[in-house]
Amino acid sequence: MDKVLNREESMELMDLLGLERAAWGNLPLMRKAYLRKCKEFHPDKGGDEDKMKRMNTLYKKMEQDVKVAHQPDFGAWHSSEVGSDFPPCPDTLYCKDWPLCATKPSAHCPCMLCQLRNKHVYRKFLRRDPLVWIDCYCFDCFRQWFGLDLNEEALLWWSHIIGETPFRDLKL
């Protein structure tokens, strides 16, 4: 919503609608105010024609850009565009074989725990300095950062955080 109009335009639209700027993004409220102000600014009803034109321009621009952002295929992806690196089962997505994957990660294992641990080893070799949590999302960095033992509860917390982390941030 913040990218629909620039700051000056959004402030001007809110002023024309007679709404507080904190209401920006409340589309039903903005729509009601727009319809009310259309009656007030309409030249045939003795209103200000310039304000009416400007309000229409800004409102239509905002409305159009919001519709584009909310179309079903906006930013969508198709399965054909994404590789099948991970098995479909969510139980094996994060850790395929506990505790083997946590103690001896395999380069051939598709689970996130092994993939991130192997990436950790590679990046540590390139950088020659220690990696820390958020710089590296592997299970070992997570446990070290939070002082957790090697157990399934720590794995559960790690997998929950990894599940909420955007894939691009994992640097895989």
UniProtKB/Swiss-Prot annotation:
Positions of the zinc fingers (C4-type)? 101-114
Q: Keyword Ribonucleoprotein, does the record have it? A: no
Keyword Acetylation found: yes
Residue numbers carrying N-acetylmethionine: M1
GO molecular-function terms, A-Z: zinc ion binding
- Sequence ranges assigned to domain J in this UniProt record: 12-75
Q: Which parts of this protein are zinc fingers (H1C3-type)?
A: 120-141
Any Pfam family hit: Papo_T_antigen
UniProt entry keywords in alphabetical sequence: Acetylation, Activator, Early protein, Host cytoplasm, Host nucleus, Host-virus interaction, Metal-binding, Oncogene, Phosphoprotein, Transcription, Transcription regulation, Zinc, Zinc-finger
What GO cellular component term, any one, is given? host cell cytoplasm
What subcellular locations does the record give?
A: Host cytoplasm; Host nucleus
- Domain comment (free text): The common region of ST and LT proteins comprises the J domain. This domain is essential for multiple viral activities, including virion assembly, viral DNA replication, transformation and transcriptional activation. This domain is also required for cyclin A-transactivating activity of ST.
Role, per record:
Promotes efficient viral genome replication by accelerating both G1 and S phase progression of the cell cycle. Inhibits host PP2A by binding to the A subunit, thereby displacing lower affinity regulatory B subunit. Inactivation of PP2A in turn results in the transactivation of cyclin A and cyclin D1 promoters. Late during the infection cycle, ST may induce dephosphorylation of host MTOR, leading to the inhibition of cap-dependent translation. May establish and maintain high levels of viral genomes during persistent infection in cell culture.
Q: Could you give the subunit structure recorded for this chain?
A: Interacts with host PPP2R1A; the interaction inhibits PP2A activity.
Query: What is the name of this protein?
Result: Small t antigen
Q: What is the species of this protein?
A: Simian virus 12 (strain wt100)
